[in-house]
């Protein structure tokens, strides 16, 4: 069975802030309605991008309606390549009529001073210690080796906690021709700013970082080692090209295999996918219960939508 580099899967499919499984194929409609055991009308003509198209990247999109409110839920990947756009025209048509854009994080609102302090505290050591004091000699040596191979000072990451070091390494290990600034979420954010429609966040920077920082020091070091070993081994498949092609083609079989692989570590799967899915679903349920004839265009990490709820 193919083994994908897990840290890159997290970066592309589920987490949008690292730049600074048995998977249930339940529909997003079911995920949203499950929160309060409420019945929601599933549109029979849900515009999931299937079949052959010649009109741009297909991707994955679902529609759910309740009492006049419509939510379009787009499964996003957080980076693209130079040939990713245009998207299928259905996305542009639906977005042009949307009243709100929903994202994992509302990037138009900066954290306030207190939030910024808490975020920095989650990322960095503030007690006079450094990474070297919190991981084994072997792990620290691997980090130094990685940094020097990439032209950085051996102590460049000393101030960062293990989870942030892992994120930095994941970003640095991506090929130069991938575009972290042109993911689907940021693409539609720019369009929302141009249209001057409200942008809403289903999470915050603090809550998303909290999910990553919430693991024990030992778990963070184990995950950091996995990322370093994957990078150094040369035998682990870099999934980035395959993920991008999967999205372009709307390849559900590859999507299922990749999302399943994220649950190879159940603790990570629960914290990074299942728990976040439930929180987002509750917010989406609130939008569907406004009894207003509004349309919401919501773009979140694809693996969060298609995750195991139980």
Place the predicted regions along the sequence by residue.
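Alpha-helical scaffolding within the catalytic cores
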Residues: 56-60, 280-282
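Bacterial signal peptide processing site
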Residues: 24-26
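C-terminal motif of bacterial Sec signal peptides marking the signal peptidase cleavage site
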Residues: 19-22
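Bacterial N-terminal signal peptides that target proteins for export
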Residues: 2-11
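Structured, acidic catalytic/metal-binding patches in enzyme active sites
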Residues: 35-51, 60-271
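A cross-kingdom marker for long, charged
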Residues: 266-310
């Amino acid at each position: 069975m193919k083994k994908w580099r897990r840290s890159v899967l997290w970066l592309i499919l589920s987490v949008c802030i690292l730049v600074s499984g048995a998977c249930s194929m339940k529909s997003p409609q079911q995920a949203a309605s499950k929160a309060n055991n409420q019945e929601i009308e599933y549109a029979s003509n849900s515009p999931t991008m299937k079949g052959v198209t010649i009109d741009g990247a297909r991707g994955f999109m679902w529609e759910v309606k309740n009492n006049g409110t419509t939510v379009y839920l787009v499964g996003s990947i957080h980076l693209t390549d130079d040939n990713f756009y245009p998207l299928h025209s259905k996305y542009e048509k639906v977005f042009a009529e949307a009243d709100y854009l929903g994202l994992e994080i509302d990037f138009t609102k900066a954290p306030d001073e207190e939030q910024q302090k808490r975020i920095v505290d989650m990322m960095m050591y503030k007690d006079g210690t450094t990474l070297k004091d919190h991981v084994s000699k072997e792990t620290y040596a691997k980090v130094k080796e990685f940094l020097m191979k990439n032209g950085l000072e051996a102590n460049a990451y000393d101030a960062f906690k293990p989870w942030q070091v892992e994120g930095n390494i994941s970003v640095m290990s991506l090929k130069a021709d991938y575009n972290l600034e042109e993911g689907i979420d940021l693409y539609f954010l720019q369009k929302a700013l141009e249209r001057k429609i409200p942008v809403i966040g289903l999470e915050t920077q603090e809550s998303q970082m909290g999910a990553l920082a919430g693991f024990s020091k030992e778990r963070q070091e184990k995950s950091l080692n996995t990322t370093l070993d994957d990078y150094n081994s040369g035998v682990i498949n870099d999934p980035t090209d395959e993920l991008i092609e999967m999205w372009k083609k709307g390849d559900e079989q590859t999507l299922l295999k990749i999302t399943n692989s994220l649950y190879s570590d159940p603790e990570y799967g629960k914290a990074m996918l299942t728990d976040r899915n439930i929180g987002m679903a509750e917010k989406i349920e609130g939008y569907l219960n406004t009894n207003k004839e509004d349309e919401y265009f919501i773009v979140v990490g694809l693996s969060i939508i298609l995750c195991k709820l139980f």
